From Swiss-Prot:
GO molecular function: carbohydrate derivative binding; glucose-6-phosphate isomerase activity; monosaccharide binding
Listed name of the protein: Glucose-6-phosphate isomerase
Protein's job: Catalyzes the reversible isomerization of glucose-6-phosphate to fructose-6-phosphate.
InterPro entries referenced in this protein's UniProt entry, alphabetically: G6P_Isomerase, G6P_Isomerase_C, Phosphoglucose_isomerase_CS, SIS_dom_sf, SIS_PGI_1, SIS_PGI_2
Amino acid sequence: MVHPVELPAWKELEALAATTGRRPMRDMFAEDPGRFDRFSARLGDLLLDYSKNRIDAQVMAALVRLAGQAGLPAAREAMFGGEAFNVTEHRAVLHTALRNRSDRPVPVDGHDVMPEIRAVLARMKDFAGRVRSGDWKGATGRPIRSVVNIGIGGSDLGPVMVTEALKPYQKADLAVHFISNVDGSHAAEVLKLCDAETTLFIVASKTFTTQETIANARTCRAWLVEKLGEAAIPAHFVALSTNGKAVAEFGIDTANMFGFWDWVGGRYSLWSAIGLSIALAVGFERFEELLAGGHAMDRHFQDTPLEANLPVILGLIGIWNANFLGADAYAVLPYDQYLHRLPAYLQQLDMESNGKGTARDGATVSWGTGPMVFGEPGTNGQHAFYQLIHQGTRLIPCDFLAAANSHNPLGEHHLMLLSNVLAQAEALMKGKTGAEARAELEKAGMDPAEIAFQLPHRVFPGNRPSNTLLYPRLDPFMLGQLIALYEHKVFVQGVIWNICSFDQWGVELGKVLAKAILAELSSEKTSSTHDCSTAGLINAVRQMRQ
């Protein structure tokens, strides 16, 4: 198996990084008035401007060659074709099938999975309709007014992000809450908002054994039983799981269990039954629009030439910035308060997928892989960490996202928001030269000695890369496109880095150690296998809890 650093295009890009990669983007824009048209791409109403990167036609051509040499087209077809692309768990990777809106069959081991997917969707539609209409009643005959999703990781981050993003579409008399953290304070604060008679709990755990989720589910079960009695459980609990035995033992009627499949990774599961909270919040028709948006991006990703393919372009630009220009992180900056949970969602999607140090063939990688991801909605982030992005010593490319139209057109608020996002992208690219800074200070009437002192602090180096994603309005279809865009971007990069993007063994070791420490915290014995720091902390916790 050929590693990326051995590919001809990789070596070509290393040479280009020493030339084009160091050129001021100011000069590139000055020399090419058509740069925006040349380095932007569209899918329907979604516009990607990637012109504010240190690229030219030669760099982009080399990046596309890199994708070809790394086997991206074949890998893409293998994933969509249901092959066991998750090599360490020997599983297909078919979250795309969950949003397949075509009549195409999707085979896994020779079996078309679409009939099963459609059957689950039909059950979700029926259930969501009954709850939203008031037909589904709690144990005392009152309709449901609060939904509490209990899950963690992919069973939480995706549904939380989507329900927050689609708040303008939510049913006014149905509140949707989420409990994820095993910290009891999370459950306690959510339960304060709920009336037991009108609350429906969704327990989201594929195996129904996830420690945090089951602990929270038991707490919520005890809360309900205390108020309404054991017989109330079937009317107030449903499960998203494949473990019917454990679900039944918990007291949930397995007729109210919605299943999914082992080829659905947690961080890709919002499209599955895990999205039930989304369907309850915004209605099943809106959930279908979300699926349709994801499917539209799937078709684009599968059918569009690499050089005009939005996920491929985003992925390749990320490779260029990370592996050739030295960026260890990138910032996701949605200028949309409804997308305030998008950075956290993309942290899991990107860092859990591509935070790997082992190649698909088992070799230790000698090249950079997944970057760190962080972000905040604009304009809040401008008053927090943008200082480092503008004038710090680390290169941090940015993805800006913005809708041209607001769901809440209050005065000039949205124009102010848009002016800020466009200004930030321009400022990062242009920077401010010493001459420009001097002219500003002189115009302000500053004396020469003070100017000499202040000048180095007022210069912005610029040449900071960014992408801008612009769309008319954030609706379910557009949100589906954006989520699938980033999913496929992560896939592209994982293929080029030659890593497995669909496992997450790194989360397992801590779980195992936590089980042992849990037992020790409630006893007086400390295992001799711990290092002195961990043993000391265990003893300190015991003393503080006495």
